[in-house]
Amino acid sequence: MLNAAAADRNKDPILSVLKSRVASNRRLFALEISSGTGQHVVHFAKAFPNITWQPSEVETQSLSSIEAYRQYHRLQNVQPPIYLDVSQSWQTWGGFPAESCDLIININMMHISPLACTTGLFHGVGQILKPQGLLLTYGPYAFNGSIVPQSNFDFDQSLRYRNPEWGLRDASFLTTLGQENGLRLEEIVDMPANNKCLLFRKDSVV
């Protein structure tokens, strides 16, 4: 099993956001896109036994780690991880029908992937999220062209140096991208270490 220190640090703050906004008294289906090591999905699944959780990844090593966490924790409400390339058409995302997911989570992906992954994420989520369903994204973001504090600005510069296609995405751009795909930015939640949770609600009509 892989272990990411950042996942250990942020899993409880993100869980707190979920607990105050996601129902715990009815059956739901949640897709985590870019599940990483698998630490998040098992943590959330323990807190929400009413939700069937579907982890996904594009990296083979991560898929193996997710399955190892799933087996270790013996959680009946976590499905085996699936391969999902978010830059590809949503029809390739494991065969999910349109409007089949109550909740979709995407943690720390957008700033370390090409822009095509971000646009693909919003396009696909707009298709497979149920009306009034919730998309939660987490990470560092720019706001109206500005990146603060300095540590986030430096982080963005280091990412772009490593890969020109990486970098912090602007929340205003994501708001527009969401609107184009029937997703309304409902809330921005301040998180530790200068991160944010962006909560998008799918409107009834796309």
Curated annotation (Swiss-Prot):
Name this polypeptide is given: Methyltransferase-like 26
Can you tell me where the transmembrane regions are?
none
Which family does the record claim for this protein?
Belongs to the UPF0585 family.
